[in-house]
Amino acid sequence: MAFIAALGLLMAGICPAVLCDGILGRDTLPHEDQGKGRQLHSLTLASINTDFTLSLYKKLALRNPDKNVVFSPLSISAALAILSLGAKDSTMEEILEVLKFNLTEITEEEIHQGFGHLLQRLSQPEDQAEINTGSALFIDKEQPILSEFQEKTRALYQAEAFVADFKQCNEAKKFINDYVSNQTQGKIAELFSELDERTSMVLVNYLLFKGKWKVPFNPNDTFESEFYLDEKRSVKVPMMKIKDLTTPYIRDEELSCSVLELKYTGNASALFILPDQGKMQQVESSLQPETLKKWKDSLRPRIISELRMPKFSISTDYNLEEVLPELGIRKIFSQQADLSRITGTKNLHVSQVVHKAVLDVDETGTEGAAATAVTAALKSLPQTIPLLNFNRPFMLVITDNNGQSVFFMGKVTNPM
């Protein structure tokens, strides 16, 4: 299973900005910040991230009622947090408040240090799962930006920085797209289809997650089956299946849905939410951070006699400059934008926010001793679910088990 996302913020201004050429390292968090960054506990950051995740999901789902939805709230929020480093006053407050931070209870410094430690932890190599996340600034070559902004993006967000000539739009576009393609292993080959020659700076954030199921599906068991788009339409899909699987499960009768957790090797898991036929909108409208917490807290190991899950690969492409104002981020897109902590003057505004995500789900996984032991140890549990069939639209949430941060959230309405 692989999840890949990239987000690009395109900034235009009267006077272009530049950053000295160079690669900014991943291990340069100043020593004096090491202790302070932990003031914002990872679980606190995760709960805030969940609130933003669900708000954005509802906007995207409303705009795309019958379409697949997939996005990375962590990638989007990290990019916006970096942008807020360069913003002042009400421009900054808008961004952080939409990210669900209460600025009367937490300082701006704590927010950025919390993000910094989270991203630094995720960038550490892990035996079982591949996680690659990072940010990059592409700056026009005409004029320096403030060294303080350069230092903070490097230290807190591990951002790389490159010089680009945006007067040569096609060359600059290829430069940025090639970088993103390389970081996402070719999964996102073209983040930008076009660039404006007035562009002064592009901020890119990417997240690549490759996880292997703790208990994999056997490819030999995959078969062709119906997936019901609605009550009248269906499509043929490759359907994976596995029998006698012991995994966390809950039936939510109040919201008319079943919730299943599948674990990856390593420190991540996927929550699959299967609404009853015709109940998708009811479940979506009821989604709150408390809902996800209730499901997580109520999950109990159950034996699924047979689990069926479609094999699929879907991709999405969003222009978030149309969505973020609906959530409350407006000033960065206007001439009233104050991004003066980037350049020293109020000469920048955001003209484009592009987010692309790719979600691949297949049988891949590796059987390990721990998985076999867990399955065997829990066989004595009395409750058995006869058949759980994901043959209609469903949602999924991919989280980091250590900090509960949401890597990806999506809705699959058509696997093909």
Swiss-Prot record:
Additional comment: The single human alpha1-antichymotrypsin gene (SERPINA3) is represented by a cluster of 6 individual rat paralogs.
GO biological-process terms attached to the record: response to cytokine
The protein, known as: Serine protease inhibitor A3K
Gene: Serpina3k
Record bears the keyword Secreted: yes
PTM note: N-glycosylated.
Tissue: Liver and plasma.
Gene3D superfamilies in the record: Alpha-1-antitrypsin, domain 1, Antithrombin, subunit I, domain 2
The keyword Membrane belongs to this UniProt entry's keyword annotation: no
Residues forming coiled coils: none
Residues of the site described as Reactive bond: K379, S380
GO molecular function, one term: serine-type endopeptidase inhibitor activity
Function, as annotated: Binds to and inhibits kallikreins. Inhibits trypsin but not chymotrypsin or elastase.
Signal peptide segment: 1-20
CC terms in the record's Gene Ontology section: extracellular space
Compartment annotation: Secreted
Residue ranges, annotated region (RCL): 365-392
Matching SUPFAM superfamilies: Serpins (SSF56574)
Main location: secreted
Swiss-Prot/TrEMBL domain comment: The reactive center loop (RCL) extends out from the body of the protein and directs binding to the target protease. The protease cleaves the serpin at the reactive site within the RCL, establishing a covalent linkage between the serpin reactive site and the protease. The resulting inactive serpin-protease complex is highly stable. Variability within the reactive center loop (RCL) sequences of Serpina3 paralogs may determine target protease specificity.
